[in-house]
Amino acid sequence: MQSYSRLMQFKVKDLMIDKRRLVEVPDNATLGDALNTMVANRVRAVPVAAKPGQWLGAGGSMIVELDKQSGSARKQYIGMVTMLDVVAHIAGDDGESGLDKKMAAPVSSIIGHCPEGLSLWSLNPNTSIMDCMEMLSKGIHRVLVPLDSNTENITGPELVESASAYAMLSQMDLISFFFDQSSQLHGILSHTVTDLSAIHNTVLALTSQARVKDAIQCMSIAMLNAVPIVEASGEGEDHKQLVDGKNRRVVGTFSASDLKGCHLATLRSWLPLNALEFVEKIPRTLLFTAATSTPGRELVTCHVTSTLAQVIHMVTTKRVHRVWVVDQNGGLQGLVSLTDIIAVVRSALLSGAPDLF
């Protein structure tokens, strides 16, 4: 319990040290512009900034950036655009000209296409790590943190905020914090993902015969950021649909973030490709090499006997947002996501069970 008490002393501002300047796009930027910005800055999402007072922010939010000298409102963040928004927007059978038209759409028109974009949250820098964990364990992947909040006495999530500067806090930042504090969390992290109930046992998958355009369509409908690719059964299954991946051998991962490796012209020519071919080609493009620190397309997997410490090491070093759980033959058993990791660590800390400290 002593290590738990030390952990409780950390606040969100302790996670914001050395965070870089916020990467954003204006509301009149095209979807193509937003994609280029995400590629150039190696991020999976960008907030959308507009002139203050002209938009209702996502989820009724009012998150405003102030001029540091005058205190007047300079811009309002009206929502967030993610790689999954890109996938959802370009999904469909509209042909090449349709793709061009879709990528020319203003980003303001696609905010809220995916559940994450339905709200925009800020988190006060004085918020405790435990409260931060609660928020990020409920499907919220990232929040804005004011660097000089005008609401110093308020902690927790807010839909209304004003500050002269913001930074982004993501689930990965919190997982990296767990990694850095592994000595304090040893009692929890040394348990297996099975013991901690961190595994999602049902996983939808693409078959190895699915095409890129079908993969995009499936992910858009299911609102999934990534899906495993499993060996096709050869039994006449529909490769245009997601299948139950249980016990099938995993051969790859198709992720919305893979699109960061594509120029528009490249994406256009690759849409008819087999999805597995696509994920194998992506690492060899110069654009993808520049946009990721992960060499090649290594399949990141764990076992039911893997410890949470091992899984956290995988996600932080490989920079992946989920780990497929497989058996000794590579058969898919489930997955562990960043949301799952945060939820089980928080639950274990709150339980105060003696064997977890």
UniProtKB/Swiss-Prot annotation:
The name this protein goes by in its record: SNF1-related protein kinase regulatory subunit gamma-like PV42b
Tissue: Expressed highly in rosette leaves, cauline leaves, open flowers, developing siliques and dry seeds, but at a low level in stems and floral buds.
Gene giving rise to this polypeptide: PV42B
Organism of provenance: Arabidopsis thaliana (Mouse-ear cress)
Gene deletion effect: No visible phenotype; probably due to a complementation by PV42b. Shorter siliques and reduced seed sets in pv42a and pv42b RNAi double mutant.
Gene Ontology process terms (BP): embryo sac development; stamen development
Biological role: Plays redundant role with PV42a in regulating male gametogenesis and pollen tube guidance.
Ranges of residues in domain CBS: 16-97, 113-185, 198-273, 293-351
Presence of the UniProt keyword Cytoplasm in the record: no
Membership in a protein family: Belongs to the 5'-AMP-activated protein kinase gamma subunit family.
Keywords: CBS domain, Repeat
Keyword Ion transport part of the UniProt annotation: no
Matching Pfam families: CBS
InterPro entries assigned to the protein according to its UniProt record, in alphabetical order: AMPK_gamma/SDS23_families, CBS_dom, CBS_dom_sf
